[in-house]
Swiss-Prot record:
Parts forming coiled coils: 123-145
Gene: SMTNL1
Tissue distribution: Expressed in striated muscles, specifically in type 2a fibers (at protein level).
Name of the molecule in the record: Smoothelin-like protein 1
Region of interest called Disordered, as start-end residue ranges on this chain: 1-348
Pfam families documented for this protein: CH
Lineage of origin: Eukaryota, Metazoa, Chordata, Craniata, Vertebrata
Listed Acidic residues bias regions: 233-255
Domain Calponin-homology (CH): 378-484
Gene Ontology CC: contractile muscle fiber; cytoplasm; I band; M band; nucleus
Subunit record text: Interacts with PPP1R12A.
GO molecular function: calmodulin binding; CH domain binding; disordered domain specific binding; protein phosphatase 1 binding; tropomyosin binding
Location within or outside the cell: Cytoplasm, Myofibril; Cytoplasm, Myofibril, Sarcomere, I band; Cytoplasm, Myofibril, Sarcomere, M line; Nucleus
Length: 494
């Protein structure tokens, strides 16, 4: 009996001694009946004492196995927690190093982390499905093996009690489910660890990219410095141009510089060292304002190009803002170039004054507006009228009030000429009614003795009852000038 109880079936279960005793199975039923009902699940009748004894050690073995698996899972959890703690420390160090980074890099890291998580999720689902499928296949194979073994034993021997096999199968399936859940739990920290490793790698890649990008910053700083130098040079040139007066020698020199390229080959020096030096010792104070718009457009960046060589300033994409600023500043300089047309005019005026030996004299030079010129002319006209009145004050038939009706009889012309040439004719013999005789005598005597041109026609004066005031005024002015040249009229020297 003890050897029979110690025997194990193919699937690891103990075989009860009732299998050899056909009388014990089924409450004393014959062996043929037990063989006929071997494949059916028989729940009739209470279990025997040997069946109970077999159940107890089976349950004890299952509980021991479960406890061992639980201990193993606890150890796995502890190890996974340690690994997670080490990875968290690594993450903390990486976060400290990345604390000085910009928010844009953090955003990119989050995006990369999300992408990696989304990529890892379908992989995890596939792994879980594959593990579940393999577990199901193993369970089906295990279930098939005990069933086939039980059938073979039933053919040769009596079948063991069905309750024990059913409970054992239930316990196996439960343990398999628990192991599957624990495997899933164990895969979760592994997945987290892989996600954390992926994040750490992405952060390292970002750090390397930033470390590569950092050496480019000095280039941008150097370019900014060169741009500031160019702006300072432009401001100094503008201040020098404002300090120079319109008629100063430096301006004339600038004009000479403008004329030389226009008359010559038209070549503009590319650097300040090639510009001609001024005799006053100002050196390179020539500004771009003295040049034309085309010269400014072509040569405004030449000083900066000569200051910094291509080897000092490496070309990089950030150079575009500096070129944009230069393009924006160019219109301002172009606008200021044509705003200085006074230089040539002042020079031409000086040349005219030097050529004629002094400033222009006369009323036209004193008065520039029409009202002042008219007032001056009226003043001169009145002065000349007063002079004629004073010269003919003692003569009869003469009353000079204007340059028109007072000169209609011709007696005023004869009296004025007789004043300076009393021996030319006898004024007492003249008749105011003889107008033609009077005009002819006055104009001919003035032409002979005073060299005064005969600007008035005798026929015109006789035909007009009231002579034209402008014609009379012009003739009297010419007579006065002729008398001054003869020395007969004294003028006040200023």
């Amino acid at each position: 009996m003890e050897q029979k109880e110690g025997k194990l079936s193919e699937d690891g279960t103990t075989v009860s001694p009732a299998a050899d005793n056909p009388e014990m199975s089924g409450g004393g039923a014959p062996a043929e009946e037990t063989k006929g009902t071997a494949g059916k699940a028989i729940n009739e009748g209470p279990p025997t004492e040997s069946g109970k004894q077999e159940k107890a050690p089976a349950e004890d073995g299952m509980s021991a196995e479960l406890q061992g698996e639980a201990n193993g899972l606890d150890e796995v959890k502890v190890e996974s927690q340690r690994e997670a703690g080490g990875k968290e420390d690594a993450e903390a160090e990486l976060k400290k190093e990345d604390g000085e980074k910009e928010e844009t890099t953090v955003g990119s890291q989050e995006m990369t982390g999300r992408k990696e998580e989304t990529k890892s999720e379908p992989k995890e689902a596939e792994e879980k499905e594959s593990t579940l499928a393999s577990e199901k296949q193993k369970a089906e194979e295990k279930e098939a093996k005990p069933e086939s073994g039980q059938k073979a034993d039933a053919n040769d021997r009596d079948k063991p009690e069905p309750k024990a096999t059913v409970e054992e199968e239930d316990a196996k399936t439960a343990s398999q489910e628990e192991t599957g859940q624990r495997k899933e739990c164990s895969t979760e920290p592994k997945e987290k660890a892989t996600d954390e490793e992926a994040k750490a790698e992405s952060q390292k890649a970002v750090v390397e990219d930033e470390a590569k990008a950092e050496p480019k910053e000095p280039d941008g700083k150097e370019e900014a410095k060169h741009g500031a130098k160019e702006e300072a040079d432009a401001k100094e040139e503008a201040e020098d141009a404002e300090e120079a007066e319109p008629g100063s020698p430096s301006e004339e020199q600038e004009q000479d510089v403008e004329k030389e390229p226009e008359g010559g080959a038209g070549v503009i020096p590319s650097s300040p060292e090639e510009w001609p030096e001024s005799p006053t010792g100002e050196g390179h104070n020539l500004s771009t304002d003295g040049l034309g718009p085309d010269c400014v457009a072509s040569g405004q960046t030449s000083p900066s190009a000569s200051e910094s060589s291509p080897s000092d300033v490496p070309q990089s994409p950030p150079e575009s803002p500096s070129s944009g600023e230069k393009k924006e500043k160019a219109p301002e300089r172009r606008v200021s170039a044509p705003a200085r047309p006074r230089g040539p005019r002042a020079q031409n005026r000086k040349a005219i004054v030097d050529k004629f030996g002094g400033a222009a004299s006369g009323p036209t030079a004193l008065f520039r507006n029409t009202k002042a010129a008219g007032a001056a002319i009226g003043g001169v006209k009145n002065m000349l009228l007063e002079w004629c009145r004073a010269m003919t004050k003692k003569y009869e038939h003469v009353d000079i009030q204007n340059f028109s009706s007072s000169w209609s009889s011709g007696m005023a012309f004869c009296a004025l000429i007789h004043k300076f040439f009393p021996d030319a004719f006898d004024y007492a013999e003249l008749d105011p009614a003889k107008r033609r005789h009077n005009f002819t005598l006055a104009f001919s005597t003035a032409e002979k003795l005073a060299d005064c041109a005969q600007l008035l026609d005798v026929d015109d004066m006789v035909r007009l009852a009231v002579p034209d005031s402008k014609c009379v005024y012009t003739y009297i002015q010419e007579l006065y000038r002729s008398l001054v040249q003869k020395g007969l009229v004294k003028t006040k020297k200023k």
